[in-house]
Amino acid sequence: LRQILTTKGNIDLKPTDIQDPEYFHKVVDCQYACPAHTPVPEYIRLIAEGKYTEAYMINWDSNVFPGVLGRTCDRPCEPACRRGRIDEEPVAICRLKRVAADNRDDVIPYMPQGPFTPNGKKVALIGAGPASLTVARDLSPLGYEVHLFDEQIKGGGFMRSQIPAFRLPEQVLDDEVDYILRLGIHTHFKHYVSSLKEILEQDYDAVFVGTGAPRGRDLPDLPGRQEGDANIHIGINWLGSVAFEHTDKIGKTVIVLGGGNTAMDCCRTARRLGGEDVKVIVRSPFASMKASPWEKEDAMHEDIPIIDNHVPKSFVIENGKLAGMTFEKVEAKYDANGKRSLVPTGEPDVFYPADDVLIAVGQENSFPWIERDCGVEFDNWEMPVVDKVSFQSTHPKVFFGGDAAFGPENVITAVAHGHQAAVSIDLLCNGKDVKTERLSPFVNLHSMKMGIHEWAYDSTIDEYDRLAVPQAPKEFTLKDRKKEVELGFDPLAGYKEAERCLNCDVQTVFDAPKCIECDACVDICPTSCITFTADGEEADIRQRTKVPALNLKQDIYVADGLKTGRVMVKD
């Protein structure tokens, strides 16, 4: 529903159109917050029922990599979870996804079965990361001849090169990449594409660029950078070197610069490769770091201190070799508009010793292989000009997605880009407009009457606190960089955590002619989400609900036609 306001005296809400799937799409907050719109409550119910294979396939249809994302997702669904509004913690949606992945049966019989009838169209995918693999997964069953190019020996992109094996076991990634490649994808691994023009000359009907943001930012102007180069490493390059087993050790004293998830992966990997005194040093305050809270917690659990409010001043070189770094202490100051500045405290600079330094201060895109006269326009920041709906560039046959489109994001965003780009490519190849003829996000609507014994759950709110995911002892995991730290929920814990879900996708609808306004539904509702109230302006109604409905982005359900003239409102 798009809330429709009228202007007849008061600004009253019109009744919700329950035939419009947009309302039911938006009201399931976790699903709406997921970039790939994974139907979260649906698969959580299946997990509670022990139907892990079905739960896995629900995920695979939307997010393509349930096993990967069940371990590594940035979890945009969890801040949106309604459970977090009545408890301190939302449902552990991400880790429940892993429960389905870890306990599934053979899922190949439930996947598209080739060979597929060719439709005569050919598509090139540059880069074999999550965005490109999603495009391949979506287009191949439609009969497209899909060619996948990557300079690495396997598919996976940054999921393979930048996410350490102690967070994402290689076998988990291999399995989910192979599910896609078995759909008849023509792979060209160990093949670096050096010219987009050459690709376009090969009669592809469309080209998708999913090459990520492969260039880590450096600190080239910091004094001592060149002299200490042998022991100063770019974080993402170093992680890739470790992943492909070109690097297997590091010095005992390590400084990691940066406050994002890459910095957390670098410091934890360094601990496993011989780093005994590893510390993260970041410019910003601890609370403002870009790293996910759980990533920071995991690093500190492994005895890695995070030193905030320190700006790097120089690399210190002694006898021609890196000896450490100096830092200036700063504090965050905010102006009237909330803009932050880092202001020196005036204290003396601080020296920290280091055998090695890992720089993880950000990533940049790099497209040296795309000729600037091939029809793809670039902006002032050397980023391709890409439409945010269709993911089409200024060259009608060339599409971008993942980090290559708008800069560094995460796996689930790359998957979402891949889905949308695949839709656009299919529209283009069928002679349709890539923007005006695309459909809204798909929503499953099932209308049913349910007796009390048909509910999969009881009607009360289970009082379980959010369960912590068990971890292997660090005295073992720190000795082996491939030893997975998180053990995942067992089936019983998965069931208990699944029962914390409020089933927001199960939507009651009101039948006003049958309502006698006894308010029994209000009294029995465990979440206090139903209100009978006088009609009026939307802002006023939102304040009058039993729990004020203050999230203006979230539509409220409204039904009228009661004999008293009141309206039924559900948030």
Show where each model-derived region lies.
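Feature captures the FAD/FMN-dependent oxidoreductase FAD-binding
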Residues: 47, 117, 122-126, 174-220, ...
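A conserved FAD-binding loop/helix module that cradles the flavin
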Residues: 266, 404-429
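N-terminal Rossmann-like FAD-binding beta1-loop-alpha1 element of flavoenzymes
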Residues: 122-146, 262-271
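Ferredoxin-like iron-sulfur electron-transfer modules
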Residues: 13-33, 56-75, 108-124, 160-161, ...
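Glycine-rich dinucleotide-binding loop and its adjacent helix/turn
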Residues: 100-117, 175-197, 216-273, 378-394, ...
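FAD-site-proximal beta/loop scaffold in flavoenzymes
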Residues: 227-251, 335-408, 534
